[in-house]
């Protein structure tokens, strides 16, 4: 068994996800009789080192209370904000007595336990944190309107995945600085980058996909059925 210090896991889950075309947020779409959110949470619930799981939901969320996972004592609900950053900040207000936090996408249900273990090992070598990431193998184009501007060299490009691991005090401080400047970020590691911190990249599996479009459901269903252990 791998030993880790106690951590708290945050799920920003206040988004609406209108691109999926459903009448309810995409985290509540079911795959194998469980919602995407439940699949995303499942890997963390039974971990001894996970002290608490904070789920930031929309104040108009009528679906979460129907989930059976709410009965688990580790699960705590907080009201999220209009943006991902606001939701994470809301959850951080309820974090105490730990040095490390994980932030994981509510609609990333295919996380593999080996990737999680690799990420947590960074606690032993970095005082700041790390993110799971996957190298980009596709050719990447910079656009100018609807035209190609130029091709970007991909040898140093990575796709940021989640979960992302952070020293609690550093994350809180960096988010405070970024929001005070009115800057918009799309993940928490960007806040630390802008504050000058160097985070480790941990090579993660490419099947750790984020559900964004309807076609992603087919991939997630395949991975959950055949790959996830």
UniProtKB/Swiss-Prot annotation:
Keywords: Isoprene biosynthesis, Nucleotidyltransferase, Transferase
Residues carrying the site annotation Transition state stabilizer: 19, 26
Name of a matching Pfam family: IspD
EC number: 2.7.7.60
Catalytic activity: 2-C-methyl-D-erythritol 4-phosphate + CTP + H(+) = 4-CDP-2-C-methyl-D-erythritol + diphosphate
InterPro entries listed in its UniProt record: IspD, IspD/TarI, IspD/TarI_cytidylyltransf_bact, ISPD_synthase_CS, Nucleotide-diphossugar_trans
Positions of the record's site feature: Positions MEP for the nucleophilic attack: 154, 210
Sample GO molecular function, one term: 2-C-methyl-D-erythritol 4-phosphate cytidylyltransferase activity
Protein's UniProt keywords contain Transferase: yes
Any single GO BP term: isopentenyl diphosphate biosynthetic process, methylerythritol 4-phosphate pathway
CDD domains noted in UniProt: CDP-ME_synthetase
Domain of life: Bacteria
The protein's enzyme class: transferase
Record carries keyword Nucleotidyltransferase: yes
Pathway: Isoprenoid biosynthesis; isopentenyl diphosphate biosynthesis via DXP pathway; isopentenyl diphosphate from 1-deoxy-D-xylulose 5-phosphate: step 2/6
Subunit structure, interactors included: Homodimer.
Family membership: Belongs to the IspD/TarI cytidylyltransferase family. IspD subfamily.
Job of this protein: Catalyzes the formation of 4-diphosphocytidyl-2-C-methyl-D-erythritol from CTP and 2-C-methyl-D-erythritol 4-phosphate (MEP).
Family annotation (NCBIfam families): ispD
HAMAP family in the cross-refs: IspD
Protein name per Swiss-Prot or TrEMBL: 2-C-methyl-D-erythritol 4-phosphate cytidylyltransferase
């Amino acid at each position: 068994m791998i030993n880790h210090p106690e951590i708290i896991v945050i799920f920003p889950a206040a988004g609406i996800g209108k691109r999926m075309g459903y009448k309810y947020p995409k985290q509540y779409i079911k795959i194998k009789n469980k919602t995407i959110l439940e699949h995303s949470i499942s890997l963390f619930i039974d971990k001894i080192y996970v002290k608490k799981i904070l789920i930031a939901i929309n104040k108009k969320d009528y679906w979460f209370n129907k989930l059976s996972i709410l009965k688990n004592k580790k699960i705590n609900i907080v009201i999220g904000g209009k943006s991902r950053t606001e939701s994470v900040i809301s959850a951080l207000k309820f974090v105490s007595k730990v040095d490390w936090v994980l932030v994981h996408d509510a609609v990333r249900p295919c996380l593999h336990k080996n990737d999680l273990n690799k990420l947590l090992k960074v606690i032993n070598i970095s005082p700041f944190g790390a993110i799971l990431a996957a190298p980009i193998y596709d050719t990447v184009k910079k656009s100018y309107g609807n035209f190609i501007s130029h091709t970007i060299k991909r040898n140093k490009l990575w796709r940021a995945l989640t979960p992302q691991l952070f020293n609690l005090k550093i994350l809180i401080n960096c988010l405070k600085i970024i929001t005070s400047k009115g800057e918009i970020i799309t993940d928490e590691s960007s806040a630390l980058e802008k504050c000058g911190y160097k985070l480790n990249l941990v090579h993660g599996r490419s099947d750790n996909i984020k559900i964004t479009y309807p076609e992603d459901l087919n991939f997630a269903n395949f991975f959950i059925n055949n790959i996830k252990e």
